[in-house]
Regions:
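Alpha-helical scaffold domains
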Residues: 1-115
Length: 115
């Protein structure tokens, strides 16, 4: 999937280990971070999203799950941004299973509160 590949590439290219350390500490070292602040992460996400809309529209559930399985928290946050953007328009009953998986995978207040 080109969207996920490009998003991963862009986020890693913009990682900042100095910023990651306090982020990890804030989350009690439960997750690794790339060190990308929210505004920058959302800018990167939006840029990559715009290039791959057609792929995303038909595969957003799979992409969301794949991003949520990545190690760094920024990927989980992008997964939340993606599902928030898409699920409102196309919610089906089976999405509850995906939402349940997201709640129990890498769960912590920052993602569970949204879900």
């Amino acid at each position: 999937m080109k969207f996920k590949e490009e998003l991963v590439k862009e986020l890693i290219a913009n990682s900042n280990r100095e910023m990651a350390i306090p982020m990890e500490n804030y989350m009690k070292n439960n997750f690794s971070f790339l060190g990308i602040k929210t505004v920058q992460r959302r800018t990167i996400f939006k840029s990559v999203y715009e290039k791959h809309k057609s792929e995303i529209k038909s595969n957003y559930r799979t992409i969301t799950w794949e991003l949520f399985q990545e190690k760094e928290r920024e990927f989980h946050q992008c997964a939340i941004d993606l599902i928030q953007k898409e699920i409102k328009k196309k919610f089906i009953l089976e999405d509850i299973k995906l939402i349940e998986k997201l709640i129990i995978t890498n769960s912590w207040w920052d993602t569970v509160d949204f879900i």
